[in-house]
Amino acid sequence: MKNNKIYIKTWGCQMNEYDSALITQILKQKHGYENTKDPKLANVLILNTCSIREKAQEKVFHQLGRWKKLKQKNPNLIIAVGGCVATQEGKNIYKRANYVDIIFGTQTLHYLPNMIQEVKKNKKSVTNIDFPLTEKFNFIEYPRKPKVTAFVSIMEGCNKFCSFCIVPYTRGHEISRPVDDILLEISTLSSRGVKEIHLLGQNVNSYKGKTFNGDICKFSNLLRLVASIDGIDRIRFTTSNPFEFTDDIIEIYAEIPKIVSFLHLPVQSGSNRILQLMKRMHTIDEYKTIINKILKLRPNIQISSDFIIGFPGETLIDFEQTLQLIKDLNIDMSYSFIYSPRPGTPASELQDNVTLCEKQKRLHILQTLIRNNTTMWNQKMLGSIQSVLVEGRSQKNPKELFGRTENNRIVNFKGNQNMIGEFINLKITKINPNSLRGSYEKRNN
């Protein structure tokens, strides 16, 4: 196995990124596989997929088509497809790509080593997209040299069943990891240099994990426990649901400074009528109340959200209400997309009566408003001193470094290699469309 190499391509959410890292750890540390950045050098190609939107799903088959050429040159090459498309489509993937060897689900990635061996032995395709009792988290192997920031999944799945969303069908019902398992993972990461933890879950604030004595731990209490771990200086979490963003979570913003002043809280629409069609479990007033309560505790917190544009039945008035919500709350970051019907969801049965041209027009208007809000926030930061966690070398200029502010802004600057992994003070000197520039400011003793 020492000469075996794997190449993993990941699409989709941060949970997929976490899963890909877990796949890498399992295959490398327990089974001797080495990562390669060149698919031409790999013995196993793994595609970790997303099915949230139609275009993302089609990208999978385009990518598989490119890998088919590598398979033709090397018949022993193993191609594996995992993630949400794999769970949703199952063996139907073979109909469009019969050269695929393995199909595994979001909850069966820990079986991948055995599936690879089975393909090698029997020369037949293998499929496992079940939701097994054995949790994949039991197979975590911690990286020896992690980055200074790390994702940690605390729960998976969703019980909300919004009418547009495929996630409950591809990730299953909500399952919370035991508290001790999470704390052990974070403590281990901290001991190896991680200073910022990003807690993950499809509905992260619905976390209800068990303690060692069988008690249920709420999300707010988990945050307290994570904050108590030595070496962890920043805590982020994604993705929250307004329905369960309760007062005990809101109060954490006053209690724990390690919780960053940045919140991603998807609302999807500014219209109560559309929210009902989406089967969302909150109203606009309830959403505003949550944000305003947090703003009283953290006046400088920045809000990010999700918006679906052109949901079936969305009128111009509904859309204008969405724009007004963005203005009222100064939302300055978003994941905003044109509605894409997912087969098998209740919304796919609704009449899609908004033209593509109109959807594109509305999306442009909304994203322009968001960009304007981003510029406004960035201008407020110009000249300020920001505490930045230095993550590594800048992608655009390897001679420079980059870090992230507490409110999730990327800052590029000139600095020394030994700054990586440290918190430093940067003066914001310039604003760019997607990042900031800064200059190093020595701390006063």
Swiss-Prot record:
Radical SAM core domain sequence ranges: 144-376
Entries under Gene3D superfamilies matching the protein: Methylthiotransferase, N-terminal domain, tm_1862 like domain
Domain TRAM, residue spans: 379-442
CDD domains from the UniProt entry: Radical_SAM (cd01335)
GO cellular component: cytosol
Annotated [4Fe-4S] cluster 1 binding sites: 13, 50, 84
One GO MF term: 4 iron, 4 sulfur cluster binding
Domain (MTTase N-terminal): residue spans on this chain: 4-121
UniProt: [4Fe-4S] cluster 2 binding residues: 158, 162, 165
Pfam families to which the protein is assigned, alphabetical: Radical_SAM, TRAM, UPF0004
UniProt EC number: 2.8.4.3
Record's subcellular location: Cytoplasm
SMART domains assigned to the protein according to its UniProt record, in alphabetical order: Elp3
Positions in coiled-coil regions: none
Main location: cytoplasm
Oligomer status and interactors: Monomer.
Function noted in UniProt: Catalyzes the methylthiolation of N6-(dimethylallyl)adenosine (i(6)A), leading to the formation of 2-methylthio-N6-(dimethylallyl)adenosine (ms(2)i(6)A) at position 37 in tRNAs that read codons beginning with uridine.
Protein name listed in UniProt: tRNA-2-methylthio-N(6)-dimethylallyladenosine synthase
